[in-house]
Amino acid sequence: MGRGTGENVGFTRTVRAAVVAGAVLAVAVVSGCTVPSTLPNGSVPQVAPVGLNGMAQDPTAVGGNVWAADYFGHQLLRFDPDTGRIAERHGGLCDTDDVVVAPDGSLIATCAGEGTVVRVQRDGAVGVLAVVGRGVNPIALEPGGEAVVVGFGTTDDDRLLRVPLDGGPVEVVADGLPVLNGFGFGPDGRLYAPTGGVEALLGSTGGLIAIDVATGSTEVIPLQFDEPGRTGLAFAVGVDVGPDGTVYIAQGVDPALYAVDPATGHAALVGRSPEAAADNVLVLSDGRILLSGFVGNSVVVFSPDGTGGWIRTVTAVGS
C-alpha cells in the first residue's frame, strides 16, 4: 500500500485516535493517585507505570539501571530491562516527559505542562533548576556533564536551550528550529534530533537533523529508506546514538525503529514494535536498544543477534 492512499490516511487517523483515547484514560486512572516511593517494609512498590516516556541509563545503579519518565503518572522510576522489576521510584512530581542522570547521581527532568526543568535528588528532594516555558520536552546531558540542553515539542516554541546544572543563567543555543522530540548527542559532539512533530502523522514527513550546540547551526539529514515510496517518518518521536555514531530513530505511529548512517542518511529498519505507539529510544552500553511506549508499561528490547540482525523481546515494567 503506497504512502498517501486514502486507506493509509484512515489507518493513521484510527491509530492516532486510539493513542489519544488511551492517554485520556490514563490521565483519568491516575488522577489524584500518587504511588509511594517505598512501602512500610522498605520495599519499592511494583505498581506499573502509566507510560514510559524519556529514558536514561544510570551507569552506577545496581539492580536495574534504566530510568524512565512517566508523563501521565507524574513520576520517575528505575527498572531492570531484563525483568521489568522496579528498583527505585519518585512520585508526586510534575508532567515528567524526559530525564537524564547528572554526574552527581541526581535526576534532571523536563516538566512539559509546568514549563520547568527540575532536579530530583535520590533522597526525594525536588528543586526547580530553571523555568523555560510550557511544552519543554526533550533533554540531553552535554558531553562535558556541566549542563543539559532542552527543546520543545510544540510549534509555539522553536528554541534549543542550555541549562547549566550549577543554576547559572539559561542560554539560547538555537532558535527557528522545527518541532523537536527526544534527542541525543553523538560521539561527534553533535545533537541529533527527530523533527516534524505530530503534524507529520498524515504526510509521513518526520525527519532528522543534527545540531552543533557550539554554534547553533543545523544540518538536515535526508533519510533514505529501503521501503519503496517512503521519504519520512509518521511522527518521529525519539533518537539516541550508538558509540559508533549510528543514529537510532523511532517512528511513533505504526511504531518502528530505524538505524541511520548520518553520513548518507540511509535508514535501515531495525524492527517494529507490537505496541500501539512509541515514545523514545535508549541505546544501552551492552548494545541493546530500548523503545518505550507513550502509554502502557511495556518496553521493547532489540538485541543484536551477532549476524547483523536483531532479536525483539518485550519487557513489562512493574505489575
What are these regions (language model features)?
Residues 80-84, 120-125, 163-168, 212-216, ...:
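Short loop/turn segments that connect beta-strands within beta-propeller blades
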Residues 5-38:
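Secretory targeting and sorting signals
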Residues 68-69, 109-110, 149-150, 193, ...:
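Conserved beta-strand element within WD40/beta-propeller blades
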Residues 39-47, 85-90, 124-130, 169-175, ...:
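A short beta-strand motif characteristic of beta-propeller blades
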Residues 75-77, 115-119, 158-162, 206-210, ...:
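A short loop-to-beta-strand structural motif that recurs across blades of beta-propeller domains
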Residues 71-72, 112-113, 153-158, 199-206, ...:
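Short, solvent-exposed loop/turn segments at conserved positions within beta-propeller repeat blades
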Residues 45-64, 92-104, 132-159, 176-200, ...:
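Beta-rich, blade/repeat-based domains predominating
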Residues 280-319:
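Blade-level signature of beta-propeller repeat domains, shared across WD40, Kelch, NHL, RCC1
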